[in-house]
Curated annotation (Swiss-Prot):
Keywords of this entry: ATP synthesis, ATP-binding, Cell membrane, CF(1), Hydrogen ion transport, Ion transport, Membrane, Nucleotide-binding, Translocase, Transport
Taxonomic lineage: Bacteria, Bacillati, Bacillota, Bacilli, Bacillales
Domain of life: Bacteria
UniProt entry tagged with the keyword ATP-binding: yes
Subunit field text: F-type ATPases have 2 components, CF(1) - the catalytic core - and CF(0) - the membrane proton channel. CF(1) has five subunits: alpha(3), beta(3), gamma(1), delta(1), epsilon(1). CF(0) has three main subunits: a(1), b(2) and c(9-12). The alpha and beta chains form an alternating ring which encloses part of the gamma chain. CF(1) is attached to CF(0) by a central stalk formed by the gamma and epsilon chains, while a peripheral stalk is formed by the delta and b chains.
InterPro entries in the cross-refs: AAA+_ATPase, ATP-synt_VA_C, ATP_synth_F1_bsu, ATPase_a/bsu_AS, ATPase_alpha/beta_chains, ATPase_F1/V1/A1_a/bsu_N, ATPase_F1/V1/A1_a/bsu_N_sf, ATPase_F1/V1/A1_a/bsu_nucl-bd
Cited CDD domains: ATP-synt_F1_beta_C (cd18110), ATP-synt_F1_beta_N (cd18115), F1-ATPase_beta_CD (cd01133)
Name of the protein: ATP synthase subunit beta 1
NCBIfam families: atpD
Name of the gene: atpD1
Catalysed conversion reaction: ATP + H2O + 4 H(+)(in) = ADP + phosphate + 5 H(+)(out)
Keyword Cytoplasm attached: no
Disulphides: none
EC number from the UniProt entry: 7.1.2.2
Amino acid sequence: MKKHTGTIISISGFVLRIEFNESELPEIGFALEYHTHQGTYLAEVVQHTGINTVSAIAIGEVSGLARGTEVVNLGHPIEVPVGETVQGRMLNVYGKAIDGKPEPAAEVKWPIFRAQPLLRELDTNKEILYTGIKVIDLICPILKGGKTGLFGGAGVGKSVLMQELINNISMLGGNSVFTGVGERVREGIGLYKELEASGVLPQTTVVLGQMNESPGVRMRVALTGLTIAEYLRDEEKKDVLLFIDNVFRFIQAGSEVSSLQGKIPITGGYQSTLSKEVGDFQDRIASTKNGSITSIQCVFLPADDIDDPSAVATFSHLDSTIVLERSIAALGIFPAVNPLQSFSRALNPTFVGERHYQLAVQVKFILQRYMELQEIINVLGMAELSDEDRKLVHRARKIRNFLSQPFYVSEKFTGTEGTFVEIEDLLGSIERILNGDYDERSERDFLFIGSYKDLK
């Protein structure tokens, strides 16, 4: 098939205006190929601006690009290699190798734009995916085939928690796809080396769109990772784990592209199409009768604002929400998860059983009551509390400390061996604390242990 060519007539940042013959105008979403002194890149058609002109967003570098440069209409959206050839590899937004190894064989390629599964294809049978992380398994259990969000500001431990989840869940087997969206390259390289050392890399694909790359790359790399996961689900009928770090950078890249196109922003400077962009992306992450995609997504909170439009747009699509809080991190308790702000659709007797559900409700109640009493303690001290309230405060602090945990991925920094806590040991430990079995023990005894079996 003959490939039509066009000519760049203007360049504004990462927005290219390209002229074609009137009969050869590419469709919206089609990929255009162009060359600079740095290499070959793609652009994506986003708007028809005239009878024979289109506007395109560069999905790559524009340094060295000039008016008059020829571009080639590929006649289809960006396509990436999928299947076994990309497992154990580290790729960029185009599906090209960035791990120093030969390019993956492009036996099968899929476009990054795909329709969401039909309603009749969706699978609603859910089971719990236990992670071995106490606060998550107790308060906000993760659904197999569900979507989980890790919300937190800068430096509260989102990426470390994400890496621990990757480590623990990968040990259960299955295929994984890690998508780094606009994050630091050292984190991606570090994760790749850890996966290699732990022996789970052959079942994992790492896709990176780095912080220093163009907004087009950061906006589309999430779709590259998702497309690879969809192929495993639909064609190979496998259960897939999809890790995304960070959804905020995906939204932020969309905002930058929207601004470059001259569109009017909404509250907070976000694009007016925020809800649709997030919805189109999230609705593709689904479980069907062929297989499941279990998604765990980091969401950065600007200025620790849980009501930021980017977070609000993401909330409604999630089954489990895990909120990390700076005040808990300041106490030296990690993971710094706030059990009162975190929730899961799976925390009901149908999914976790009556015993687990009742223990989680009691833990939330005692921590909520402790927060209410904290104001009295700060002003008047513990002496002004009743005996019953003092007992409750001590138990709440023990629970708060007990929900801390040493991680495998931080062993080399802390010198403390990581722990994977089985659900029965977790529930047994919580029962003993709530029943007062450890009322005579110090609160510090419960910091960074696994279960009650580790108490000396």
